[in-house]
Amino acid sequence: MFEWLARALYPEPEVLAAGLAVGLMLDLAYPEHRGLALKLHPVHTSYIMALRLVRPGAGRAWGAAIWLLTISSHMMVYASLLAASYLVHPALHTLAVGVIVKLSMPLRLLLDTCIKASRMAAAGRVECSRRLVQGIVRRDLSGEPLGRVLSACIESTAESLVDGYTSPLTYYILLGPLGALLQRLSNTLDGAVGFKTPLLYRQGWFSAKADTLLNFIPARLTAVMVALAAPLAGASTLGSLRCIARCARLLESVNAGYPISAFAGALDVRLEKKGFYIVNGGAPYPGWRDGLKASRLAVSAASLYTVLAALAIALGGGAG
């Protein structure tokens, strides 16, 4: 009786492939949401909802409730979109899948900041570069030398490649478009409440752990993809693999060390968060050319990951 609903929520392989292509094209054409599109974006609405549910003095149980309430309410909206579009027309259903892909995997937006910041640095506009990078990282970059500014930029690119593209793509293959959205929402909630502050330490625990769990395998797969794709960006596969083996566990984060060390080794640069960690410490700080190369490396790794994802979708169709 509900077989149609299963096909609507987890489409056939050809629809998954077409939806992925549509979503990536939408991302290239319209990378940054503004106005009403931004206000209705699930990353924005879930972030606001989670913060509004925070209660002073609440513990881990309420933190789990924040995650469940926020995730389930958003998933219901997009599940309804998939179901309704499926009943109307196959083309509309494919478009709905593509829209969810676009909302869940903002690849171009993740890359643009690093490219712009590196170009500003190349032009000698260090303060402009600093302001751009400050917009994507939490650490205070005021007074930091350009090398540490570009380090923060490359680190953010490496982490965002996992959080914003390869991880949701992994769950897209496994669970369909709602799987990609689940990962993106979970990552957003970690960014909203997953902090070790007196107010959020207990309430954010569940969101932080959920994000760590969901990204555990994709982070490691992505590090391997970065190493394999390194020659496409003029970087070093061997250097990347060596740095992963040597430095991936230096960070407090269970996952972030893998893509960051993969980038550091591939580019042969020192990536540092002052007072917290130094990755590939024997190498020089990155310059603007390294920032541009990091963007090319991210594109190369994402492209390789996408090709393998498409192959997995095709093999799934053949198995079916």
From Swiss-Prot:
Signal peptide: none annotated. It comes from Aeropyrum pernix (strain ATCC 700893 / DSM 11879 / JCM 9820 / NBRC 100138 / K1). The chain crosses the membrane at residues 8-28, 57-77, 81-101, 161-181, 221-241, 297-317. Converts cobyric acid to cobinamide by the addition of aminopropanol on the F carboxylic group. HAMAP family: CobD_CbiB (MF_00024). It is found in: Cell membrane. This is Probable cobalamin biosynthesis protein CobD. It comes from the Archaea. GO terms for cellular component: plasma membrane.
